[in-house]
Curated annotation (Swiss-Prot):
Source species of the chain: Homo sapiens (Human)
Residue stretches of biased makeup (Basic and acidic residues): 519-535, 574-583, 741-757, 1146-1178, 1186-1225
Bias (Low complexity): 53-72, 249-260, 429-452, 548-563, 674-683, 693-703
One GO BP annotation of this record: regulation of translational initiation
Protein's UniProt name: Eukaryotic translation initiation factor 4 gamma 1
Region (EIF4E-binding): 607-618
Subcellular location: Cytoplasm; Nucleus; Cytoplasm, Stress granule
Residues annotated with Phosphothreonine modification: 207, 223, 647, 1211
A matching Pfam family: MIF4G
Domain MI positions: 1241-1363
Chain positions found as Phosphoserine: 15, 314, 1028, 1077, 1092, 1145, 1147, 1185, 1187, 1194, 1209, 1231, 1238, 1596
Protein's job: Component of the protein complex eIF4F, which is involved in the recognition of the mRNA cap, ATP-dependent unwinding of 5'-terminal secondary structure and recruitment of mRNA to the ribosome. Exists in two complexes, either with EIF1 or with EIF4E (mutually exclusive). Together with EIF1, is required for leaky scanning, in particular for avoiding cap-proximal start codon. Together with EIF4E, antagonizes the scanning promoted by EIF1-EIF4G1 and locates the start codon (through a TISU element) without scanning.
Length: 1599
């Protein structure tokens, strides 16, 4: 029956599965089912032939195309159309290549589907086919746009009439509506619209969707398809299509709708006149009877979408003279149900016998209009005609529940595909894969609704309901087996056959490509609802059917809805069944598909403003279009999920949905496959059942947008756990050492030097971060132990120190001192290893480089300023301005820090005056503010050192220039004031108004906090006293008269804060009284305070009540205490109360730890003892106060206030001891007044004594204090505490403690038994202590060795006793080895070996049994203990005096250097040869021999030159050179410091390279107390030498 292509014809309804381009009017568009080209939306039409060749069966596999998972729906039977109308039939099924051409699909993916309609000749002069409109103008209403397949575009006067199916809501902005009227040609054109429409809405149609421009897919996204015959005379007529409320879809003009595959029709169908009665063709299905349905479509003017009134198919013409579209539906012989269930597609019957005539200007006929006839009963009894007054609204955007509301449904004619058996629908859909339609369009609005209202409703509905339509479509597609709601009405067998044939021949083929085109359209035009669907992925509201409006008559669908599903449906998933139930419910004509809340807009309220809540709109979240990525959008990874297109069949990983508000998962347990159950939160997502939307072919939940989020998140593609995820790997990833491979370790070895360097820098950085005045000495020791042995490391260390110094100017003094200590550091250069570079040179170069950096900074600032001026926007300009200001601020801070650091280096004599003058001149020349600020900082730092007598003229010039700058007032006031401050500073002889604000020690901080707290306490007490007076009121008078509690029983008013509790600077007290007039025991401050001179600032704060009682019991006539009368008047309670305050305040003042509390108590007890003896007869003249001495020491040690107080306490104890001696002389010995001290008390006293001794190193005082403890049986506590407290202190502290114990042993105050007992308690724990103190054995040896050195205890006895607790532990040898090592350093190994042998010691006593003694001795190098090495006859340890005499004799005799060498080797032991004694004796002898004893004394340089070799041999290192200089200093002192003598020696020694400059600098800065005699004069005499030395070094550095 294929007809030749016609020259004219209406645009055919686009087949959903076929890409079809739009063609210009008048061009034919033969359909070629081949792989379409991906073209643009507005691709120009391509002339194609209207001939439909035989099409192959559509592939059932879903792999090559996106197809609905719903079963196939039978297509409508072909209809008989009038003779003369050309019909293009599709005799065979069409093959579906898996093409991915460009698609134009409604925006929400619910594109309209139109069966390949038969084309009819176009009458010339017919009305235009929506000129100017194009598919791209309308996003959702128009049918799918398939540019890859040619479609004929007819002249503007012809309107195509594709069948309208339930179309998903779209987002295109424009649309025109047309009223479709269906007439039965067999009944004389009777209007059977209402009959058909009322009977066709029971459920989604199983016919394959036919999407034309105006086809409406049903709510599940699919549109039933029927063969359509477009009559030429109806092309000018439009169809007004109503939107379903709640499913927003954009308006579309008919031009939007994509023509289906064109089928030229032989003759035009008769056009119904506006006033004519509708002509409905009764469906006669027996045999091949053909029924023609003429659909009269009334076209209304474009109306705003605000009205959602359904369009009615009124028999009378609308005022707009809408064209009537006739649809002829011809059904051939029915197809048995078995065919639907048995085979996906039966062989199509000739299309000639299965045609539907739809008269619609845009070539689209709503599917709802066709469904009734398609599903008519087998008898094909003509349905009762609906009253012409009740128009049947048709929703082009798949809003069926509103279309037929109120339209009576003919029970006899149930043309809805839902009535078909679901088996058939399943199988047909399996082959055709059309999207199932959740519901047909029930009538929703009364006939009185106007088109304008309808369009108003549509515009809002389509934007929101489009999502719901898509959700329904997606649901139907996802459910692999879901096809029809269980309540669908079964189709008679004969009708089923016809439906299947028609579907197979005409529409089934279009489904797959329709899916792809929906995706394409979503890619291109999804801007409104589509993007909303991607942006907000919320669970869809379950689409629950609404009760029909009052005026609606439920059609036969209600009957069909009650039909249970067939038994075969037991295999379907719950998801599919839920969708079917949902679809069937929503298709009922008298019901609304969506449930509208009471306060929500309803389709019936046409004039009301449309409002939809969030849940309602979220119901459209999972529609098909929402699951596709629109084409043409920018790549926005945060918004668009790319993989939704590429892998639509991938099952959703439920673990990705844990955070989604999703409903309960109703998937049966056997289908979960071990997946985690989703949490039951939020509204259900998929449908009424709340199950997850199913993916195509039922492969599990479709991956969709996630639930509502409080904050936007990235949409991350679901990744299966089985996928191999490639992680980004860094090329040089860090690995812990334990994880590194051999290759990594090899590379690490290659870079070992670099890693060591970096480790060095890290350690230096750590030390610098901890550098404080208090920690300086400890940290400097760590620095000197670092391996700074290359130029690179030295430069790196210098850079670290320098950067730290200039960034922290307040600590520049500490950093400068560190540099001073490192000044002598030398390392070989990288280029010339033989040439060395020293620390000082590199540091000065670094300072100079930073000082001269101003020019570079200026260039950078100019560049930034230029960039800022050229900035285009104000924002960019502001940003650049901030950067410029920040850069200038940083440069300024660096300059100031550098200047301060340079000044501190100069003060330490590391820079010469010449350099500093150069800096001052350079800064003074530049009158910019930065330079002047640096100048002020520099002069403030070093002005006092530069402003000496010789340099005053130069300094005057500087300050005159500064005064000029101030007077000119060309600089800012800030700089002028800074300059003025420097002038004032010089005027005040460089004495600043405020002290140095540098860093403070912890003790200073504690003391300041203590003073502040004390002041606050005073204020509080004063306020309390005032407040109590005010509260009591009454006349002013004595406090006792007002009952003030601060008055004691004796009538004395106790001051709230006694003076005794205030911190007192005892150093100021000597200014008040003469040193000799103060009795250190009698001066008491405040009753009970008992602050004495001897007690320091802590004075007796810890006195006990018993002490106070004893004081109160003293006779008032005591002349030794001028305050004794006052003392007696104070009751014990008052003193006790005040004493508490005093104790707390004093403890804060002293800054001691909690452990020192006992120290205070112990001192107070001593104070009590003293108080007890105050009343005894003593002669003040015989007593001498030690306070003056203590104060002098305090001046020498300002940083040791604690030591000062302890020294004062020791002094008082010593005075007490003297008193006791005198008493013993006059009286017989008396036992102490109080009982012996307890262990706890003794420990507290011992702690105080030891602390005081270690601070002052006053041996006599300490011995006397221990003697006064009068507890010889408990002195082991003193020993134990002494060893324990010094174990982790410095070596000097341990040495001093050992000497104190030795002295106590020698004096008899400490027995050896007590000494050993005290040591045992420590030695027993030594092995455990070794974990925390690795060098514990060395430290113990340092404490024990002094006893042996002085001969206090024999070596044998001592070694055997102290090793008793260590032998079981096997540690005895460890301690002895350390002791022997220290003894060898002091007396030589031979003397130590002699002592060892004399004591009869053997290593066998101290080593574990079985250990090889010989191997041990050899390993530890203690062979001298075995006596194997005999001392040479001539070698002996000469005393220093004898050595000096012998060397002087040799040199006086003029002995050669070699002879002196020989004598030394022959007569001195090896130990003495390398000792400092030989160096000092040799230096003294050589220098003395070089002096020319004339007036004035001079140096014979020739002698020194001759003896240079002799000195150089033994002055082998810097330490020996320093000892030589000490010897020279002592020699000059003995000669009474002859002028210039030392300078001449220094010059000669330096010139002969006997003493190197580093040793000179070390001597200059040495603070060794043993070498201070005459040091000041000597240093002054060689000032010129050191000045010259530094200048010469500077010159060499510059050269």
């Amino acid at each position: 029956m294929n007809k030749a292509p016609q020259s004219t014809g209406p645009p055919p309804a686009p087949s959903p599965g076929l890409p079809q381009p739009a063609f210009p009017p008048g061009q034919t568009a033969p359909v070629v089912f081949s792989t379409p080209q991906a073209t643009q939306m507005n691709t120009p039409s391509q002339p194609r032939q209207h001939f439909y060749p035989s099409r192959a069966q559509p592939p059932s596999s879903a792999a090559s195309r996106v197809q609905s998972a719903a079963p196939a729906r039978p297509g409508p039977a072909a209809h008989v159309y009038p003779a003369g109308s050309q019909v293009m039939m599709i005799p065979s099924q069409i093959s579906y290549p898996a093409s991915q051409g460009a698609y134009y699909i409604p925006g929400q993916g619910r594109s309209t589907y139109v069966v390949p309609t038969q084309q009819y000749p176009v009458q010339p002069g017919a009305p235009g086919f929506y000129p100017g409109a194009s598919p791209t103008e309308f996003g959702t209403y128009a049918g799918a746009y398939y540019p890859a397949q040619g479609v004929q575009q007819f002249p503007t006067g012809v309107a195509p009439t594709p069948v309208l199916m339930n179309q998903p809501p779209q987002i295109a902005p424009k649309r025109e509506r047309k009223t479709i009227r269906i007439r039965d040609p067999n009944q004389g054109g009777k209007d059977i619209t209402e009959e058909i429409m009322s009977g066709a809405r029971t459920a989604s149609t199983p016919t394959p969707p036919q999407t034309g421009g105006g086809l409406e897919p049903q709510a599940n996204g699919e549109t039933p398809q029927v063969a359509v015959i477009v009559r030429p005379d109806d092309r000018s007529q439009g169809a007004i299509i109503a939107d379903r409320p709640g499913l927003p879809g954009p308006e579309h003009s008919p031009s939007e709708s994509q023509p289906s595959s064109p089928s030229p029709t032989p003759s035009p169908s008769p056009v119904l006149e506006p006033g004519s009665e509708p002509n409905l063709a009764v469906l006669s299905i027996p045999g091949d009877t053909m029924t023609t349905i003429q659909m009269s479509v009334e076209e209304s003017t474009p109306i705003s979408r605000e009205t959602g009134e359904p369009y009615r198919l009124s028999p009378e013409p609308t005022p707009l003279a809408e064209p009537i579209l006739e649809v002829e539906v011809t059904l051939s012989k029915p197809v048995p149900e078995s065919e639907f269930s048995s085979s996906p597609l039966q062989a199509p019957t000739p299309l000639a016998s299965h045609t539907v005539e739809i008269h619609e200007p845009n070539g689209m006929v709503p599917s709802e209009d066709l469904e009734p006839e398609v599903e008519s009963s087998p008898e094909l009894a003509p349905p009762p005609a609906c009253p012409s007054e009740s128009p049947v609204p048709i929703a082009p955007t798949a809003q069926p529940e509103e279309l037929l509301n109120g339209a009576p449904s003919p029970p006899a004619v149930d043309l809805s595909p839902v009535s078909e058996p679901e088996e058939q629908a399943k199988e047909v859909t399996a082959s055709m894969a059309p999207p199932t339609i959740p519901s047909a369009t029930p009538a929703t609005a009364p006939s009185a609704t106007s088109p304008a209202q309808e369009e108003e409703m549509e515009e809002e509905e389509e934007e929101e309901e489009g999502e719901a339509g898509e959700a329904g479509e997606a649901e139907s597609e996802k459910g692999g087996e879901e096809l029809l709601p269980p309540e669908s009405t079964p189709i008679p067998a004969n009708l089923s056959q016809n439906l299947e044939a028609a579907a197979a021949t005409q529409v089934a083929v279009s489904v797959p490509k329709r899916r792809r085109k929906i995706k394409e359209l979503n890619k291109k035009e999804a801007v409104g609802d589509l993007l909303d669907a991607f942006k907000e992925a919320n669970p869809a509201v379950p689409e629950v059917e609404n009760q029909p409006p009052a005026g609606s008559n439920p059609g036969p669908e209600s009957e069909g809805s009650g039909v249970p599903p067939r038994p075969e449906e037991a295999d379907e998933t719950w998801d599919s069944k839920e969708d079917k139930i949902h679809n069937a419910e929503n298709i009922q004509p008298g019901e609304q598909k969506y449930e509208y809340k009471s306060d929500q807009w309803k389709p019936l309220n046409l004039e009301e403003k449309k409002r939809y809540d969030r849940e309602f709109l979220l119901g459209f979240q999972f529609i098909f279009a929402s699951m596709q990525k629109p084409e043409g959008l920018p790549h926005i990874s945060d918004v668009v999920l790319d993989k939704a297109n590429k892998t639509p069949l991938r099952p959703l990983d439920p673990t990705r949905l844990q955070g989604i508000n999703c409903g309960p998962d109703f998937t049966p347990s056997f289908a979960n496959l071990g997946r985690t159950t989703l949490s039951t939160r939020g509204p259900p997502r998929g449908g009424p059942g709340g199950e997850l939307p199913r993916g195509p072919a039922g492969l599990g939940p479709r991956r969709s947008q996630q639930g509502p989020r409080k904050e936007p998140r990235k949409i991350i593609a679901t990744v299966l756990m089985t996928e191999d995820i490639k992680l980004n790997k860094a090329e040089k990833a860090w690995k812990p050492s334990s994880k590194r491979t051999a290759a990594d370790k090899d590379r690490g070895e290659e870079d070992a030097d670099g890693s060591k360097t970096q480790d060095l820098f890290r350690r230096v950085r750590s030390i610098l971060n901890k550098l404080t005045p208090q920690m300086f000495q400890q940290l400097m020791k760590q620095v000197t132990q670092l391996a700074i042995d290359t130029e690179e490391r030295l430069k790196g260390v210098i850079d670290l120190i320098f950067e730290k110094a200039i960034s922290e100017p307040n600590f520049s003094v500490a950093y400068a001192n560190m540099c001073r200590c490192l000044m002598a550091l030398k390392v070989p250069t990288t280029e010339k290893p033989t040439v060395t570079v020293n620390f000082r040179k590199l540091l000065l170069n670094r300072c100079q480089k930073e000082f001269e950096k101003d020019k570079d900074d200026d260039e950078v600032f100019e560049k930034k300023q230029k960039e800022m001026d050229e900035a285009a926007t104000a924002e960019e300009r502001g940003r650049l301005k901030e950067e410029l200001e920040e850069a200038r601020d940083i440069a300024r801070r660096r300059s100031l820090g550098n200047i301060k650091f340079i000044g501190e280096l100069f003060k330490l004599k590391m820079l010469t005056e010449a350099i500093m003058h150069d800096c001052v001149v350079k800064l003074l020349k530049n009158h910019d503010e930065e330079s002047l600020e640096c100048l002020c900082r520099l002069l403030t730092t070093i002005g006092k050192d530069l402003d000496f007598e010789k340099a005053k003229p130069r300094m005057d010039q500087y300050f005159n220039q500064m005064e000029k700058i101030i007077k000119e007032k060309k600089t800012s006031s800030r700089i002028r004031f800074m300059l003025q401050d420097v002038l004032d500073l010089r005027g005040s002889n460089w004495v600043p108004r405020r002290g140095d604000q540098g860093p403070k020690t912890i003790d200073q901080i504690h003391k300041e906090a203590e003073m502040e707290e004390h002041r606050e306490h005073i204020k509080v007490q004063q306020l309390m006293a005032k407040g109590s007076d005010k509260r009591r009121g009454g006349p002013p008078g004595p406090p006792i008269s007002r009952g003030l509690p601060l008055v004691d029983d004796g009538g004395w008013n106790t001051v709230p804060i006694s003076k005794g509790s205030r911190p007192i600077d005892t150093s100021r007290l000597t200014k008040i009284t003469k040193p000799g007039s103060i009795d250190s025991n009698n001066q008491l401050f405040a009753p009970g305070g008992r602050l004495s001179w001897g007690k320091g600032s802590s004075g007796g704060s810890g006195a006990k009540p018993s002490d106070a009682a004893s004081e109160a019991a003293r006779p008032a006539t005591s002349t030794l205490n001028r305050f004794s009368a006052l003392q007696q008047a104070v009751p014990t309670e008052s003193t006790d109360n005040r004493r508490v305050v005093q104790r707390s305040s004093l403890s804060r003042e002293r800054g001691e730890k909690a452990g020192d509390r006992g120290d205070r108590l112990e001192r107070s007890e001593r104070g009590g003892d003293r108080g007890d003896r105050l009343d005894r007869a003593r002669t003040p003249a015989t007593k001498r106060s030690f306070s003056k001495e203590v104060e002098e020491r305090s001046r020498e040690r300002p940083s040791q206030p604690e030591g000062l107080r302890k020294a004062a306490s020791l002094t008082e104890d010593r005075d007490r001891g003297r008193d006791a001696v005198k008493r013993e002389a006059a009286l017989p010995p008396v036992s102490p007044l109080k009982a012996a001290l307890s262990e706890e008390e003794l420990e507290k006293k011992s702690k105080a004594i030891i602390e005081e001794y270690l601070h002052l190193n006053d041996m006599k005082e300490a011995v006397q204090c221990v003697q006064e403890l009068a507890s010889p049986s408990l002195l082991f506590i003193f020993v134990r505490h002494g060893v324990e407290s010094t174990l982790e202190r410095s070596a000097i502290a341990r040495e001093h403690m050992g000497q104190l114990l030795h002295q106590l042993l020698c004096a008899g105050h400490l027995s050896t038994a007590q000494y050993y007992q005290g040591l045992y308690e420590i030695l027993e724990l030594a092995e455990d202590m070794e974990i925390d103190i690795p060098h514990v054995w060395l430290y113990l040896a340092e404490l024990v060795t002094p006893i042996l050195q002085e001969g206090g205890v024999p070596m044998g006895e001592l070694f055997r006793e102290i090793t008793k607790p260590l032998r079981p532990l096997g540690k005895a040898a460890s301690l002895l080895l350390e002791i022997l090592g220290l003894l060898c350093k002091s007396m030589g190994p031979k003397k130590v070996g002699t002592l060892w042998r004399e004591a009869g010691l053997s290593w066998k006593e101290f080593l574990p049994e079985g250990q090889d003694i010989g191997a041990f001795v050899a390993e530890q190098k203690v062979e001298y203990t075995l006596g194997e090495e005999s001392e040479a006859p001539g070698q002996r340890a000469l005393p220093s005096e004898e050595l000096n005499r012998q060397l002087e004799k040799l040199l006086k005799e003029g002995s050669s250097n070699q002879r002196v060498f020989d004598w030394i080797e022959a007569n001195l032991s090896e130990q003495q040869i390398v000792s400092n004694t030989l160096v000092r004796a040799l230096m003294t002898a050589v220098c003395y021999s070089a002096i020319i004893f004339e007036t004035p004394l001079r140096v014979d340089v020739a002698v020194l030159k001759a003896r240079a070799k002799l000195l150089q041999k033994y002055l082998c290192d810097e330490q020996k050179e320093l000892q030589a200089l000490y010897a020279l200093q002592a020699l000059v002192v003995t000669l009474e410091q002859p002028p210039n003598l030392l300078r001449m020696f220094f010059d000669a020694l330096y010139d002969e390279d006997v003493v190197k400059e580093d040793a000179f600098y070390s001597w200059e800065s040495s603070k060794d107390p043993a070498e201070q005699q005459g040091k000041g004069v000597a240093l002054k005499s060689v000032t010129a030498f050191f000045k010259w030395l530094r200048e010469a070094e500077e010159e060499s550095d510059h050269n």
